[in-house]
Curated annotation (Swiss-Prot):
Plays a role in the modulation of host immune response by modulating T-cell function. Interacts with host PTPRC/CD45 and thereby reduces host TCR signaling and T-cell proliferation. It is found in: Host cell membrane; Host endoplasmic reticulum. This is Protein UL11. Its main location: host cell. It is a single-pass type I membrane protein. Glycans are attached at N42, N84, N92, N99, N141. Residues 145-200 are annotated as: Disordered. Keywords: Glycoprotein, Host cell membrane, Host endoplasmic reticulum, Host membrane, Membrane, Signal, Transmembrane, Transmembrane helix. The lineage of its organism: Viruses, Duplodnaviria, Heunggongvirae, Peploviricota, Herviviricetes. Glycosylated. The keyword Signal applies. One of its GO terms (cellular component) is host cell endoplasmic reticulum. Interacts with host PTPRC; this interaction affects T-cell signaling.
Length: 275
């Protein structure tokens, strides 16, 4: 029965699958919070909107059960089985990366399931989930790569060549001198003279997330801003899915085409209905 329905409504099923894939793509490609870090320091990543009793999960990379690091349900569990990184799960639901190296450069995600009743004022209710993503970028000096403007310089080199030809005969001696031929070539060389970039002062420990100091991470958006952006993306995805379903379920493009043919040729065409 399902196969028969898909056969007769394959266009609708295809459009619906594309819309679902688009919604999933938006969900998994939210902009992550950028966290620059210096080799040998500690980095603290904070969960947002967390109360006692809420369920919090920390994972790295693409996430999933095999990459869990911390689990608060609400009892705290640290999972070091599938990771070679030194970290600690703090009692305030934060993740502490200890003595980071360049191998720590990765995505770190926190998923919070709201259980506490205090979330009802925000219309979240129970079992509502909030995802937050961080991208920790570890370098030797703790700064992001910057591009510098090159100032070219030009040097000129001139080469002069002179040719003299002398011809002599037996009866009459005639000396012929050709005109001096000078060839000048100019070659341009570019030399880069980049300006030296200044390295900002680093800190022993970097705190990121709700309540963190903004001076250490000037490029980092606030978690509240990411929360609003996630809501907006989901609303946009739902609206797009609804529009696509309405357009292709009621066959609006086909009906517009038939109306145009009727006005052009004066022929009444009856659209084929589904079986």
């Amino acid at each position: 029965m399902l196969l028969r329905y898909i056969t007769f409504h394959r266009e609708k099923v295809l459009y619906l699958a594309i819309a679902c894939f688009f919604g999933i793509y938006i969900s998994f490609h939210d902009a992550c919070i950028l966290v620059p870090a210096k080799v040998g320091t500690n980095v603290t990543l904070n969960a947002v909107h967390v109360h006692d009793g809420d369920y919090v999960y920390w994972s790295f990379g693409g996430g999933g059960a095999n990459r869990l690091m911390c689990r608060y349900t609400p009892r705290l569990d640290e999972i070091h089985k599938n990771t070679n990184r030194s970290f600690s799960c703090l009692t305030n639901h934060s993740l502490l990366l200890i003595n980071v190296t360049e191998e720590y450069t990765d995505y770190y995600r926190t998923m919070t399931t709201f259980v506490h009743q205090s979330h009802n004022w925000h219309n979240h209710g129970n079992k509502w989930t909030l995802d937050t993503c961080y991208y920790v970028y570890v370098t030797q000096n703790g700064t992001l790569p910057t591009t510098t403007t090159k100032k070219p310089t030009t040097t000129t080199r001139t080469t002069t060549t002179t040719t003299t030809k002398k011809t002599t005969t037996t009866s009459t001696t005639t000396t012929t001198t050709t005109t001096k031929k000078t060839t000048t070539s100019t070659t341009h060389h570019r030399h880069s003279n980049p300006k030296e970039s200044t390295t900002p002062k680093t800190h022993v420990e970097l705190h990121v997330g709700l309540g963190a100091t903004a001076a250490e991470t000037p490029l980092q958006p606030s978690p509240q801003y990411q929360h609003v952006a996630t809501h907006a993306l989901w609303v946009l995805a739902v609206v797009i899915v609804i529009i696509i379903i309405i357009i292709f379920y009621f066959r609006i493009p086909q009906k517009l085409w038939l109306l145009w043919q009727h006005d052009k040729h004066g022929i009444v065409l009856i659209p084929q209905t589904d079986l």
